[in-house]
UniProtKB/Swiss-Prot annotation:
Protein name per Swiss-Prot or TrEMBL: Cytochrome b
Main location class: mitochondrion
Binding positions for a ubiquinone per the UniProt entry: H201
Name of the gene: MT-CYB
Keywords associated with the record: Electron transport, Heme, Iron, Membrane, Metal-binding, Mitochondrion, Mitochondrion inner membrane, Respiratory chain, Transmembrane, Transmembrane helix, Transport, Ubiquinone
SUPFAM superfamilies referenced in this protein's UniProt entry, alphabetically: a domain/subunit of cytochrome bc1 complex (Ubiquinol-cytochrome c reductase), Transmembrane di-heme cytochromes
Record bears the keyword Nucleotidyltransferase: no
Molecular-function GO terms, alphabetical: metal ion binding; ubiquinol-cytochrome-c reductase activity
Stated family: Belongs to the cytochrome b family.
The species this protein was found in: Episoriculus leucops (Long-tailed brown-toothed shrew)
Amino acid sequence: MTNTRKTHPLMKILNNSFIDLPAPSNISPWWNFGSPLGICLIIQILTGLFLAMHYTSDTMTAFSSVTHICRDVNYGWLIRYLHANGASMFFICLFLHVGRGIYYGSYMFLETWNIGVLLLFAVMATAFMGYVLPWGQMSFWGATVITNLLSAIPYIGSDLVQWIWGGFSVDKATLTRFFAFHFILPFIVAALAGVHLLFLHETGSNNPSGLSSDADKIPFHPYYTIKDILGVLLLILALTSLVLFSPDLLGDPDNYTPANPLNTPPHIKPEWYFLFAYAILRSIPNKLGGVLALVLSILVLAIIPLLHTSKQRSMMFRPFSQCLFWILVADLITLTWIGGQPVEHPFIIIGQLASILYFFLILVLMPITSLLENNLLKW
């Protein structure tokens, strides 16, 4: 008798993706971040759906509706904080997932990597629009500042900004369309994640050594299902701890003040996961230059495969490249810190140096070091 999971048209897809999938026997916990990302997306869609049942996307009532969710709706406070902190967890997993890809050379799977970069942009757009919805001070001014950056685009800039705003300032039309886009984008992200997996399963997973693992494969279930469950449980533990003990730790106190177009907050800053890009934006005194640097800070990921000069795929056996990778991580942490600081000495110069180092490491130092390592190994 044939097994249903191997013959049924729908079950067959799931079987080939999560049960009988041949996986390398030596993949480390750094390969675990795909499943927590999937769980994060499911948590965000479910909590978001319940929030949308009570939220109103009108400038007069948006702030009050969020207050109503927290005070009057059964476990509304829990749903709201799970959604807000779930986004932070999502980005932590995303950054670790991308970092793993860079360290172990997973970017050599071009389609998978490029869809991953597209996914990163989509998730960032979703998070930005979600931050605007509570209509607090930082929501309003964050939306104003970030959308205004598009005015730096020559010729069509100012028209484009007014088109996005739906008027001459961030107002009711902006809030309504941001809510609509914030609702639809996670489903687009889910579809892209499916395509991401599709292309990954065409090639099979990479592994820490960067060598072909065709000679030594094991089934995904039970080995990696149980391993992934551990990662997911740790994610849920971290998320629930954050939500139940310190839900406002990563938020901005300014967002507990209703939006007021007549009163600018002293320090306008985005959520913590955008601070590195915000620091790069602020480090360039020219508006258009800043916007280009901001976009390139993420888009540079797409050209990393073109800059791969090493004859080895992974950094596992390349100590100099490892050193540069960890300097890059430290640089990104520095940029995140600078993004949250006021624009004054010494933060300005630190931000500028960290921004230069970020691009210099990726575009110049890492490719040159890879060539040097090739020569050291007489390759």
